Amino acid sequence: MAELVSVAILGYLLGSIPVGFLMGKLRGIDVRRYGSGATGGTNVLRTLGPWAALFTVLCDIGKGLLAAYLGERLAGEWGFVAAGLLASLGHSYPVWLRFRGGKSVATSGGVMLLHYPLAVLVGIAAGALAVVPTRWVSLGSLTASLAVVLQLFLLDAPLSHRLLVVALAVVIYVRHWENMKRIAAGTENRLGVKARPRA
């Protein structure tokens, strides 16, 4: 039990590293004051540009992957689950930023990348197919998340892994609640639109 608690804390701390926020600070910009207010890759793209966004996404994937790897290495199967889920939650709710972070898509993808790289790639492809005609990145993120969940159930993955991927999807969908409302209304921001200062 102590091992699980330890790797959960480790996962949270890794996940809570606010890469997008730090990228903005290097340029004197607080990305939380623009666009969606999130610190993840999409808002960084709209606020700081593609290179900063690419770096942010790769780091967010990396911290999820590292948390999952260390969790499993130190505490086995359920360590993978605990560290992976807490990394995702840490990304979305970092204590350092008063629990205002990103939306956990890249970090959750990094977690699942440890055991299911093909499923993640298929999820990315499915997400891209949703983005191309709509230019709604949020719709792509939601589609990718759902695609990975479905694949793990079709693959009859271990119960612990299926529970984890469902939990990660719940985090992603909760964090995209406002996006989903805008998608339903047809008012969601489209790819290529620059972030505006928040009121």
Swiss-Prot record:
Domain of life: Bacteria
Reactions catalysed, as given in the entry: an acyl phosphate + sn-glycerol 3-phosphate = a 1-acyl-sn-glycero-3-phosphate + phosphate
Compartments where located: Cell membrane
GO cellular component terms attached to this protein's record: plasma membrane
Gene Ontology terms describing biological process: phospholipid biosynthetic process
Stretches that traverse the bilayer: 4-24, 51-71, 77-97, 111-131, 152-172
Metabolic or biological pathway: Lipid metabolism; phospholipid metabolism
Membrane topology per record: Multi-pass membrane protein
MF GO annotations: acyl-phosphate glycerol-3-phosphate acyltransferase activity
Keyword Membrane attached: yes
Keywords recorded for this protein, A-Z: Cell membrane, Lipid biosynthesis, Lipid metabolism, Membrane, Phospholipid biosynthesis, Phospholipid metabolism, Transferase, Transmembrane, Transmembrane helix
Enzyme class: transferase
Metal-binding is among the record's keywords: no
EC numbers for this chain: 2.3.1.275
Alphabetical list of PANTHER family matching this protein: GLYCEROL-3-PHOSPHATE ACYLTRANSFERASE-RELATED, INNER MEMBRANE PROTEIN YGIH
Subunit structure: Probably interacts with PlsX.
Family: Belongs to the PlsY family.
Purpose of the protein: Catalyzes the transfer of an acyl group from acyl-phosphate (acyl-PO(4)) to glycerol-3-phosphate (G3P) to form lysophosphatidic acid (LPA). This enzyme utilizes acyl-phosphate as fatty acyl donor, but not acyl-CoA or acyl-ACP.
Name this protein carries in UniProt: Glycerol-3-phosphate acyltransferase
